[in-house]
Amino acid sequence: MEPFLFCAACGMIWDKSEVETMARKTRVVRTELPAGRRVLAISDAHGNLPFFQGALKAAHYTPDDVLVLVGDLVEKGPDSLTLLRAVMELAQHNTVYCLNGNCDNLVREFAEEPGAVEDPFYDHYLKMWGDRCLLIQMGRAVGLDPRGPEDLPALREAVRKHFAPELAFLASMPEIMVTPDYLFVHGGVADEEQLEGLDAWRCMKNDDFLSQGHAFRRWCIVGHWPVTLYHPHVPSAAPLLLPDRHIASIDGGCSLKWDGQLNVLELPRTPGGDFRWYAYDGLPTAVALDGQIPSSDSVNVRWGRNVLEVLERGELLSRCRHLETGRELEVLNEYLYCDQDGVTRCEDSTDYRLEIAPGDTVSVVRRLPDRALVKKNGVTGWYFGRLGEKR
């Protein structure tokens, strides 16, 4: 048997013995959302404080609103500790429900599980994510600079000693929250009626959830799997709503995707009403001066399905063949990389041309001499017209 398990959505490698220690039952909170107040759901902030603040501003968040954080508040972002403390402070004064995601579980497991400091996973994870790891941020906050497995015992003691409030807050987060009309869970569940007996880890890390065919009576609000991974042709980070199955998937790829965003889903005030959404991507904006018709056929080369053959190298772009589809497209050179096996892959790339009208405001992902990679309403694509400054 292989000694490690690979987590597709977050790039973690889990030791099998570690997985066994986490085989506990899910914690379920059953409640009713406060009547007459706006409810906003956010998932997968991943330690990105500016995106969290920007998303709340985009949604015109006020203390009267109810905030539901659907997991993965921390890890993989530069501000995990700062964001965690900001949410702890926010929760003292406002109505905030925080759910446990697979990344939120990591620090608590490290601090509490017997044998954690001997587990090779933690050394691997800290080296993989470095400054973007909450454990590293905690260590440095108290003067430690963990670099290898020999530093883990001291790091564990420091986390236990200096971060008791943070550990308690993380430990308090349930995996599932259920109301009469909604079910909130980070990864996903197969059945909304038999929740208490479910394995907690599988609720937090449920890869490719929408492809499993589940449908619900309540609306099931999930994160974990960046929504662009569900789109084979046109990349989109906008919340993905499936009314016929009552599922809303809202992970916009914040901190993980180069064109990612943090989404805020506003729930309908009454059952059967319309959802609204807001987002923040931190990108510069510009105004399109020329119109452009959209592509009729395109490909979204996305994580996990991104093996390429480089056909011709250019100065900024390279002509590549996407091996899964056989399609040829131009890929930004800075997006190309080789994995540990020497296989050429790329960050999420596309040949899609956005539909643009003169005067449209777009987010600029990359600007090249003859084109720009831009976003409009959460959709990423190429624009070959002129861009002007936004006034």
Question: Positions of the model-derived regions?
Answer:
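Active-site environment of divalent metal-dependent phosphoester hydrolases
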Residues: 46-51, 75-78, 103-108, 191, ...
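Short, basic/aromatic beta-hairpin or loop at an interaction surface
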Residues: 276-289, 325-343
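SH3/SH3-like beta-barrel superfamily modules
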Residues: 303-332, 356-391
